[in-house]
């Protein structure tokens, strides 16, 4: 195979990897956790991954404790738990 063909194959494989959504087996296990507001009394708008709806949704975080299913932005949540 020529070097041009190898570059084309590499480019196609890279594109495929970027466009393939994360499956349940590839998703970090903390994405499956229910949102936890934590033990503090803050009222911070945060995002969590909802396993049932397969969407990133809003919850209110107290500011400490909780779990790792807690994101600052929907984009961060989607990239981590839903896929690109």
From Swiss-Prot:
The keyword Disulfide bond appears for this protein: yes
Keywords: Disulfide bond, Glycoprotein, Hemostasis impairing toxin, Protease inhibitor, Secreted, Serine protease inhibitor, Signal, Toxin
Compartments it resides in: Secreted
Domain BPTI/Kunitz inhibitor, residue spans: 31-81
Protein name as annotated: Kunitz-type serine protease inhibitor B3
A single GO molecular function term of this UniProt record: serine-type endopeptidase inhibitor activity
UniProt cross-references to SMART domains, sorted A to Z: KU
Tissues and organs where the protein is expressed, per its UniProt entry: Expressed by the venom gland.
């Amino acid at each position: 195979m020529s070097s041009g063909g190898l570059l084309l194959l590499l480019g196609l494989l890279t594109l495929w990897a970027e466009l393939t959504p994360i499956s349940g087996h590839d998703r970090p296990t903390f994405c499956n956790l229910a949102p936890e507001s934590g033990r503090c009394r803050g009222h911070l708008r945060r995002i969590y991954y909802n396993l049932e709806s397969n969407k990133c949704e809003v919850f209110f975080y107290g500011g400490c404790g909780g779990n790792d299913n807690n994101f600052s932005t929907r984009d961060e949540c989607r990239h981590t738990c839903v896929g690109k």
